[in-house]
Amino acid sequence: MAAATMALSSSTFAGKVVKLSPSSSEITGNGKATMRKTATKAKPVSSGSPWYGPDRVKYLGPFSGEAPSYLTGEFPGDYGWDTAGLSADPETFAKNRELEVIHCRWAMLGALGCVFPELFARNGVKFGEAVWLKAGSQIFSEGGLDYLGNPSLVHAQSILAIWACQVLLMGAVEGYRVAGGPLGVVVDPLYPGGSFDPLGLAEDPEAFAELKVKETKNGRLAMFSMFGFFIQAIVTGKGPLENLADHLVDPVNNNAWSYATNFVPRK
């Protein structure tokens, strides 16, 4: 890493040294230095991977055509599709890539949170309210909201208190991520590793590169799932498992097309 940094800090042109980046003394100034490290570029994956490089899997397979020149297959989830040109600018691409990964992770957690309470309730586990779109409103009931139906865990009775806790907790987590940890030493805020990888899944570079692709693919699917859950909540007012059960009982009358053509906003 040190050798790479030195190589990037200077170069030669016509026999003269040309400085490409400031020295450490120029950065520190009056003795003040930042511990934050910038994220490195994605390490190249072996040419045998079907998910990276110019010969990677494309969005339409053999009918995809030529991918844009700026989509080189360097990052996970790059299928060579960017009709709107959203990734043409490198800075915009880096920002959108970070936003996508973060939203993928939240969507995967959200999808689990929408499905599993309803699944547990259908199998005898008691919840105050298992349907995700109705669970939050329990805080306005007379007894308040008990987490996991247990008043000894968290007994919430104030929406303002819950909001304040959410702001503090989420702000702390997001601040930790953006700042690169308490000392700013995290190299890549998207894949920090260390204590965030207790199982050591990132130790093998090849396996880690494939896990990044799986995360992106499952995250995109989860975002579409959450969008579907939102639409279902607006149209039917039911949870995803109840909607699935209704569809399996009567698929002709309980499907997206029948609801779209006969939709009347619920009162």
Swiss-Prot record:
Belongs to the light-harvesting chlorophyll a/b-binding (LHC) protein family. Chlorophyll a 6 binds at H247, A256. PANTHER family: CHLOROPHYLL A/B BINDING PROTEIN. The chain crosses the membrane at residues 101-121, 153-173, 182-202, 221-241. Chlorophyll a 4 binds at N218. Chlorophyll b 2 binds at R105, V154, L183. The LHC complex consists of chlorophyll a-b binding proteins. InterPro entries: Chloro_AB-bd_pln (IPR001344), Chloroa_b-bind (IPR022796). Chlorophyll b 4 binds at Q166, R177. Chlorophyll a 3 binds at Q138, L148, E215. Residues 28-47 are annotated as: Disordered. The keyword Disulfide bond does not apply. Chlorophyll a 5 binds at K214, Q232. This is Chlorophyll a-b binding protein 22L, chloroplastic. The modification Phosphothreonine is found at T38.
